[in-house]
Amino acid sequence: MEVRLADCAGFCFGVKRAVDTVYEQLKNGKTIYTYGPIVHNEEVVRELAEKGVRVLESKEELKNLKAGETIPTVIIRAHGVAEEIYDIMEANGLECIDATCPFVKKIHRIVEQKSTEGYHVIVVGDPKHPEVEGIVGWCQGPVTVLETPEQAENFVKTEGEKLCIVSQTTYNYNKFQYIVEIFEKKGYNDSVVNTICNATEERQRSAKTIAADADVMIVIGGKHSSNSRKLYEICQRECEHTYFIQTLDDLHLDLPKAVRLVGITAGASTPNKLIEEVQNYVRINF
């Protein structure tokens, strides 16, 4: 039996950069907070909590954090935040370490500029995802979040209105293209910017390729990880026996007979050591 790992699995550039930033700041002996969990992976967050890193879960908690004898350090995670969050930190005298993914920062600049120029911004993505909430928070005018093709079909723009369409970096690439086609048929393609991260596209393509050939597919990722859930959806369409796990303890394989290939992929917030644990476990026990 072969165990094959997808080419693009585990920490992406932005997540690794954010996690490394937290560990670097810990070396300085500071009081460290992250605005929201640094990554959507409970194991990583738990390890950092054991080292004293605290998580600010809401804007209200951030507002209540003020500089005293010491100046708290707040790290912005890779998902990025709305412009308002920076203003709160500055007003409260907090030290801000910005670990926003550069690809997300680029979207902030695009929507800020386009909305200032009078465009109605369309963000394709999950309205409850922190990255999308951050993007919306940089728009200076009308903004609409669309998550499904059905919502795109039902969207009607105001006559004479210009649209700028962007995407959550981890959105399903094929679904984004389909939504863009819907807008093009309506004549709503004034400004379309594919802001899906290249690593996300490659991760999804790689997972789909392996899943199409695999008898069993394992997707490793946090239960709150948007990109991990999308990987699971993609793999499940290609491979009937697809498992979505957060840790090795979640893995209860019921393998079909005559398994040739077990494929493994992982979300952008999944640490390499966890991927290796799952790989080794499958190789040894099956």
Q: Where on the chain are the PLM-derived regions?
A:
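The feature marks the mature, well-folded catalytic cores of soluble enzymes
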Residues: 1-286
